[in-house]
């Protein structure tokens, strides 16, 4: 496989889980890939559908793994959700099922927490998900709150195996209310447009690197980027055959961008 055209791209948008790390384990070839990005003056952005951590926390997580990357290189679905609400409904209220990364992003744009009569019910990943909060969310949506989810990932990779992700968590609320959530993360074009804007490059000059066909690859393809599927996360080569579209490149991991 000739990777010269890929290496010539000016900008790289990379997913994190299953691409850069699995849980707390850095994946093989990542150090070399990040060094290559820096040495070749590439513009790069880690664009994650996870809403649990802030850019600062993601920076610190990679720092603990031995990678020193500036906070400006991270953008999350929590930030995308906050930016959407700031533009669509400034000063709105919300009942939030989510981790501090989501809550803080919403606070920062002036969203007020409200568990009585909120404008929105917002669902992200959290370890505190339980029957009580599902029931509360269902009742609020039935009473008129609009339903938003930070991303459409059904599952996500961890060092222990596959874990349920945001779409799995919001599904009971959708089923119980008959309302469909609006999903903010990849492949939502708003997320990709923001990523390209932060990179400062045009779509034809950039590549999207991810481990999911249904979010990363389709997001890149529909936004006009070259797409790189890495098999280090939750997608196998066989899985690709189940989709009507194909990535531009299929690699075992990001290290092959440098060495392949």
Summary of predicted features, one role per range:
Residues 2-42, 53-75, 82-260:
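Asp-based, Mg2+/Mn2+-dependent phosphohydrolase catalytic module
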